Amino acid sequence: RKPYPSIIIGVRKGGTRALLEMLSLHPDVAAAENEVHFFDWEEHYSQGLGWYLGQMPFSSPHQLTVEKTPAYFTSPKVPERVHSMNPGIRLLLILRDPSERVLSDYTQVFYNHVQKRKPYPSIEEFLVRDGRLNVGYKALNRSLYHVHLQNWLRFFPLHRIHIVDGDRLIRDPFPEIQKVERFLKLSPQINASNFYFNKTKGFYCLRDGGRDRCLHESKGRAHPQVDPRLLNKLHEYFHEPNKKFFELVGRTFDWH
């Protein structure tokens, strides 16, 4: 059968792939392989819910289906569309330090260009215009979490959106995954022994029934060297937006 899924709605470069892989350790989770882009791409949305459910893996009656498309979080039309499919849906949102997320966002696009042997400007060229922070840079906008979350809160109460601390998930995955299990009403099946620290890679990998697997080598890539003064500008820029976000969700995060 193919029931409505729970959705990891974002954020891009927040740790959505890691979260989905970790959740997949649970026997009662059936995870969609690819980012479906149903609610944000018109050519998919126009094909209707039947098409969407067709992209989901088959699941048994006791299983929960999960899909992730990080672009959903920052796409203004998506919350209403998700709500019209299933107002009672449980949503997962994984966030990390907004400045770090911007650097990671740049790094991904930079490496995509490198692989295609295409030139790509330095991060400074995106972040600075006329000696000031370039607030028109899309990656900055994606890190204004309070702006995008407000859009979702017009359609869903906060208790329907579980916010995963992406920085903690990478440092110490098990406690964060336990919270996700509880939120999704899954039985506690994932254990601390499912995670082991890989010294070579510098982050946690997964152990699943004797099978070890690490996230794709694109994960944990080094960010570009950024001038400390520019980093400070980034931190200053996000200071107020972060405060607004903390007020919105009633909790704080250990961000710059």
Report the location of each language-model feature.
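The conserved 3'-phosphoadenosine-5'-phosphosulfate
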Residues: 150-243, 250-256
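PAPS-dependent sulfotransferase catalytic core
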Residues: 1-73, 85, 89, 99-129
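Short histidine/acidic/glycine/proline-rich micro-motifs that form metal-
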Residues: 37-39, 69-73, 138-139, 166-170, ...
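PAPS-dependent sulfotransferase catalytic domain
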Residues: 77-80, 84, 88-93, 100-184, ...
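Generic structural signal for small/hydrophobic residues in well-ordered secondary structure
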Residues: 15-16, 52, 66, 82, ...
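Marks the mature luminal ectodomains of secretory-pathway proteins
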Residues: 10-12, 22-23, 180-184, 244-246
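Structural motif corresponding to alpha-helix initiation and N-cap regions
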Residues: 46-49, 75-76, 146, 228
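Generic structural signal for well-ordered alpha-helices
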Residues: 49-53, 79, 149-150, 242
